[in-house]
Amino acid sequence: MHSKFFAASLLGLGAAAIPLEGVMEKRSCPAIHVFGARETTASPGYGSSSTVVNGVLSAYPGSTAEAINYPACGGQSSCGGASYSSSVAQGIAAVASAVNSFNSQCPSTKIVLVGYSQGGEIMDVALCGGGDPNQGYTNTAVQLSSSAVNMVKAAIFMGDPMFRAGLSYEVGTCAAGGFDQRPAGFSCPSAAKIKSYCDASDPYCCNGSNAATHQGYGSEYGSQALAFVKSKLG
């Protein structure tokens, strides 16, 4: 009843009225929305991306978030047994579907991407294109719509296996690259929106031998990552 009255009132305002769809978007769409993608074998939800996801939510009251729904697996029975390659392919598709769908519903909402480990890899490919040849993913196109890319204001990747030292957005002590590192000369069209964190002792995003390093980026770089996001959101 109230919604019908509200709509009728708007229509009665004449040509100068704000379009109804625009009003409905303002009533239902947040100013900022965060997508989080978890690491391999993490339980459904945000996994270790939660540090930055929650930081953004706390810094911007009224902002919202959702987790990317994908296997996050590497063949382990605990995550359903999907191979890493299959999980990555499903993850890239899930990122594209979730972000593009949200953007079509809330085209004025600023978007933040936060991916940890495999979660960073799938977001990296979806946003930057270039494919993921080591995992058999040969589609090199950017998977997000141009409208969605425009509204992605910041992207944080932590422990991303596609890390390659020397790219403009790479941060940390790693001077090498991950097991799915980008090829020499790769250029991401959204490079200015990204910070990707990896340290030398990490065996997944770099060539180190300390697996514990891989789980420490939230505490090591969380504040720095949040500051970058804030600088991009304005």
UniProtKB/Swiss-Prot annotation:
BP-aspect Gene Ontology terms: cellulose catabolic process; xylan catabolic process
Catalytic activity: Deacetylation of xylans and xylo-oligosaccharides
GO cellular component: extracellular region
Keyword Secreted: yes
List of catalytic residues: S117, D202, H214
Thermal activity characteristics from the UniProt entry: Optimum temperature is 60 degrees Celsius.
Signal peptide: 1-17
Domain of life: Eukaryota
Subcellular location, principal: secreted
Disulfide bridges in this chain: C29-C106, C73-C79, C128-C188, C174-C206, C198-C205
Induction behaviour: Induced by xylan and repressed by glucose. Expressed at neutral pH, but not under alkaline or acidic condtions.
Metabolic or biological pathway, per its Swiss-Prot or TrEMBL entry: Glycan degradation; xylan degradation
Function description: Degrades acetylated xylans by cleaving acetyl side groups from the hetero-xylan backbone.
Complex and partners: Monomer.
Family recorded in the similarity comment: Belongs to the cutinase family. Acetylxylan esterase subfamily.
Full protein name: Acetylxylan esterase 2
Name of the gene: axe-2
